[in-house]
Amino acid sequence: MRIDVLTIFPEYLDPLRHALLGKAIEQGKLAVGVHDLRQWATDAHKSVDDSPYGGGPGMVMKPEVWGPALDDVSSGTASTQDLQSALPHLSKPRHDDIHGVEARSYGESEDSDKPLLIVPTPAGKPFTQADAQAWSAEEHIVFACGRYEGIDQRVVDDAQQRYRVREVSIGDYVLIGGEVAALVIAEAVVRLIPGVLGNRRSHEEDSFSDGLLEGPSYTKPREWRDLQVPDVLTSGDHARVDRWRREQSLARTWQRRPELLDAAELSDADRAYLETLEED
């Protein structure tokens, strides 16, 4: 996969070289280019914004800058050095690489030669785990990180000639710019590229992978500050452990995100357990 990011703060995207994404770069599964949008500004001040038509507060990012930038990135003519991994020591396998199962994709990318353009915006469609799974099969993803009052809408409209455009929100709140959202989405997507995480079960059992929140996790020691690991987890009875984990997942979802239960695939045993929670 290749990821390109257009931003006026290239340094903000340095985390893309670290941790899991750095590992993917080191493995050759990911290439990342971060582009300074001001390279395409033509005035002496390298300005990228102007006042909005119709009046109002704030500034709007200019189409004369964004248009050529997106043109160059889509055609591969933008000049930038790809990020280098900050983790050059990852030639050694880690525990989740050793015990993994066969890597395979979650699906195929959309049948199109156009790159996927993601525009983070609070006015966008909510980003979901299903999006992350689908986009993990993409060959080329471009992030357009807006600032101020956003990007001139004509940029988004025009980009549809060269891209498959998705305006996406990561939550019902407003950030200063799209860089944080780009980091969030990139990590959610890249970790699902086959072979990046190592053990496929690590993300098959994640929150939202089956429509529910993930339950609590425990490790050694068995007792810590007078708090015990639940006995069922040390029982050796795998069927009991699986059922306990399922019930914990159901309970946490019921308590924190009950609306998710409407779309989740629930067994008769699941429904019976939820009824006991409601009775309590």
Curated annotation (Swiss-Prot):
Q: EC number(s) in its UniProt entry? A: 2.1.1.228
For this protein, what reaction is catalysed?
guanosine(37) in tRNA + S-adenosyl-L-methionine = N(1)-methylguanosine(37) in tRNA + S-adenosyl-L-homocysteine + H(+)
Question: Which SUPFAM superfamilies does the record associate with it?
Answer: alpha/beta knot (SSF75217)
A Gene Ontology CC term for this entry?
A: cytosol
Subcellular location per the Swiss-Prot or TrEMBL entry = Cytoplasm
One Gene Ontology term from the biological process aspect of the record: tRNA N1-guanine methylation
Residues binding S-adenosyl-L-methionine: 146, 170-175
Family recorded in the similarity comment = Belongs to the RNA methyltransferase TrmD family.
What task does this protein carry out? Specifically methylates guanosine-37 in various tRNAs.
The protein's name in its UniProt record: tRNA (guanine-N(1)-)-methyltransferase
